[in-house]
Amino acid sequence: MENQECGACRRIALIDAGEMPPGPIIYNSEHSFAYDAPWKYSEERVAVLTKKHIATIHDLTPEDDAVVLDLMEALKAASQYLIDKKGGYEILMNQGRFQNTKHIHIHVCYEVYEE
């Protein structure tokens, strides 16, 4: 596990160990992970995460090029999943004061609800 303090890192470790069954796994590779994840703000959501603990996009370095490229592959798979299932999607990525989970992750959603 990359970071014991990070909820996303702990979740990825449990899923990889087969101890936490998420919704359907959409993409799983050395660097990225995407799964169908219920969310109170959307009828349908796929969470796309880096497996390496990187808190924000501002923490990316040139050494993370492979992670970024693979994250885009995971994002493509998640997007196609929602195109096939719902016909469309929105992509959300929070940073700064809007980022509750300090681990790079992208929400690929169908119809985001207003609070």
Language-model segments: what does each one mean?
Residues 1-115:
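HIT superfamily nucleotide-processing domains
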